[in-house]
Amino acid sequence: MIFPTKFDVIVVGGGHAGTEAALASARMGQSTLLLTHNIETLGQMSCNPSIGGIGKGHLVREVDAMGGAMAIATDEAGIQFRILNSSKGPAVRATRAQADRILYKQAIRSRLENQPNLWLFQQGVDDLLVEGDRVVGAVTQAGIQFRARAVVLTAGTFLDGKIHIGMNNYSAGRAGDPPAISLSARLKELKLPQGRLKTGTPPRIDGRSIDFSVMTEQPGDLDPIPVFSVMGSVAMHPQQMPCWITHTNEKTHELIRGGLDRSPMYTGMIEGVGPRYCPSIEDKIHRFAGKESHQIFLEPEGLTTNEYYPNGISTSLPFDVQLALVQSMRGLEHAHILRPGYAIEYDYFDPRGLKATLETKVIQGLFFAGQINGTTGYEEAAAQGMLAGINAALQIQERDAWTPRRDEAYLGVLVDDLITQGVLEPYRMFTSRAEYRLSLREDNADMRLTDVGRQLGCVGDVQWALFETKREAVARELERLRSTWVSPRILAEAEAERVLGKGIEREYALADLLRRPNVTYETLMSLKGMDGQDLGGPGVAEPAVREQVEIQLKYAGYIDRQAREVERHDHYENLKLPAEFDYMAVKGLSIEVRQKLTKQRPETLGQASRISGVTPAAISLMLVHLKKGGFKEFAALPPNTEAAA
């Protein structure tokens, strides 16, 4: 009888973190087992039917650049695509897509089932096998033991999950799925630092009962239609659908206020803290009491269903209040609710107990990714899952870990924030969290990370060939623009005014002309000489290459300045702190700082500097102590390094 029970990596959970973790590990050649309580829910979008957004779209592009599945699955399932902040600078532009839930799950499952080195098995996990301080496997509900050299735990909201609808509550991982109570209890036995968080979801509405004629239509972008993945294309997209906009009103707000005495949030039944940037409708009405109306987006759940997701009214109010508040809004007077909204509480574990690899500090080989680390959102989960899967594989291969820095990726910002600052509420990514966001754009995610992904072994041949072609095309076009000159002798003043806004008084390289505020790559390519010959073009046709060339030239000064800033910080950012470092012995440190550093054990000086309460003066004292102590990397530092810190 042949049934494999020994693997290199076990991934527990088949959500966005688990699927990316399993795919990454398997792409890198490790035998990988993905355990899920239900194979039918692999890649399920548990809340809103959308991928991307401000900060989140950047993470999706980074996962894609490393060979991940989320972006290409969205291209195959996306029923509306938009570029947010399109009128603003490239650093904050972000792709957002509405996705057909069924098509998205199909796209993810297809990749899982066709990925070499990856096995799927349907069983919930009740226990982890731990020998000494190392995890060695997992035990399912049926008592089946699987052994592995690394385990990635991506439990989502399932750990001791509890759903609240009004004053009623029951145990669940999400609506329709059982919780992971035994696994939660087992993790508590392992003395991992733990807390409770909560999130919520709105009621779903039957589209046949919605009067769209009185709502505002919100179509997707059409010129051009955005594409998420470097491997994607518009031809992959299914039929496109609009969203619709309505608003709450004073009657809605009165109904909500009248139901607060039966709200689990406002009666103390819910202990967990909810997401600040995705508040429930009752929280909005309470916190923004002076606001007369809130915008609500009706988002289609898919092409083959009438179900709509009313984005903006997440709630745990009793069902009768939910029905009344929905029907109080314009266009929803006769709305039929298909599923009630609810809040869910769940266990999470303090991410300050993790290394930058997402491996736990106390149990070797055990990695955490997704909501278990206190984050919220599909995109944040997928990025963490990929990182955990990569590092689990690297550990087994006895290779150096990969931990992106804050100046390299939004994923680096995400993980650094989690492991140095922890969370008091579900963490959501925004572009404002990244101090080097001009260098961490959506458009250059592949230029930043695909080379790294190839070296790690998680970027395939087809994607690599596409990337090399693009990189070479960008380099060639930049060189052409820098070496092609235009002078007043061959450029008529009228033509210069048409393209450049004014005439030129001397010879200019095309690259310098493109840097002018009102000149675009497209208009520059149309520049003609006095004899009618092309002076600017024909240029390149590939939109991604044109975009990269234009941004690199127009923002060169700012990007170079940011690169110099990164270089200044590099002298201490990546200095590894000794594992045995005794913070209590550092003279001049406050007791609070000593205790925090001793508890969190930061891996680098840069991480230490971002722990709450650790001041620049404290970092300087640590540097002095380390240099005097003769610690290898610090003894060779130049004089006055501590002053620069």
Swiss-Prot record:
GO molecular function, one term: flavin adenine dinucleotide binding
Binding of FAD, residues: 13-18
Top-rank lineage group of the source organism: Bacteria
Cysteine disulfide partners in this protein: none
Range of residues in the leader sequence: none
Record SMART domains: GIDA_assoc_3
Compartments where found: Cytoplasm
Cofactor: FAD
Keywords from the named record: Cytoplasm, FAD, Flavoprotein, NAD, tRNA processing
Single GO BP term: tRNA methylation
First-listed, main subcellular location of the protein, grouped into a coarse class: cytoplasm
InterPro entries registered for this protein in UniProt: FAD/NAD-bd_sf, GIDA_C_N, MnmG, MnmG-rel, MnmG-rel_CS, MnmG_C, MnmG_C_subdom, MnmG_C_subdom_sf
UniProt xrefs under SUPFAM superfamilies: FAD/NAD(P)-binding domain
GO CC annotations on file: cytosol
PROSITE patterns documented for this protein: GIDA_1, GIDA_2
Gene3D superfamilies referenced in this protein's UniProt entry, alphabetically: FAD/NAD(P)-binding domain, GidA associated domain, C-terminal subdomain, tRNA uridine 5-carboxymethylaminomethyl modification enzyme MnmG/GidA
Binding-site residues, NAD(+): 274-288
HAMAP family linked to this entry: MnmG_GidA
Family the entry assigns: Belongs to the MnmG family.
Family matches, as PANTHER family: GLUCOSE INHIBITED DIVISION PROTEIN A, PROTEIN MTO1 HOMOLOG, MITOCHONDRIAL
Role, per record: NAD-binding protein involved in the addition of a carboxymethylaminomethyl (cmnm) group at the wobble position (U34) of certain tRNAs, forming tRNA-cmnm(5)s(2)U34.
Self-association and partners: Homodimer. Heterotetramer of two MnmE and two MnmG subunits.
Protein name (record): tRNA uridine 5-carboxymethylaminomethyl modification enzyme MnmG
